[in-house]
């Protein structure tokens, strides 16, 4: 799945029973003032927040991911525009990629240049095309 500036509501969180490991690429702007990255009255936060488990952590646990690394998202050689958290070594070879974009609000990024931090359609396709319903594609 590939949510962009979306969070998981309490009802979904309480009733979700995924039978498959789920590859997830999530992109969210830190400046989003519509669906706050830290959650809100109807939505869970994306990351752990006190005693409330975050959405990414929820899926990391379902997918049984064992490795994590974080890297800077660069625009050009000298400008960091956010961070990319990558959870890997997960069940069925799936991954979770969490793009946290510093100067982005609640808008769709598409060009990858100028005011658009990343080309979201390309990021989504490059990620999801690596998987099937059963997990990671086997390279031939």
Language-model segments: residues:
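Flexible, surface-exposed loop/gating regions in the mature catalytic domains
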Residues: 1-140
């Amino acid at each position: 799945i590939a949510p962009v500036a979306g969070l998981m509501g309490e009802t979904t969180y309480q009733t979700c029973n995924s039978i498959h490991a789920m590859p997830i690429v999530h992109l969210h702007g830190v400046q989003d003032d519509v669906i706050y990255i830290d959650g809100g009255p109807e939505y869970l936060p994306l990351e752990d927040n006190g005693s409330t488990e975050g959405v990414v952590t929820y899926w990391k646990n379902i997918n049984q991911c064992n490795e994590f690394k974080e890297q800077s998202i660069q625009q050009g050689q000298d400008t960091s525009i956010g961070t990319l958290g990558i959870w890997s070594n997960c069940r069925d070879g799936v991954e979770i990629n969490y793009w946290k974009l510093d100067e982005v609000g609640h808008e769709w990024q598409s060009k990858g240049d100028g005011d658009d931090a990343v080309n979201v359609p390309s990021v989504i396709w490059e990620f999801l095309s690596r998987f099937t319903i059963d997990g990671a594609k086997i390279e031939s």
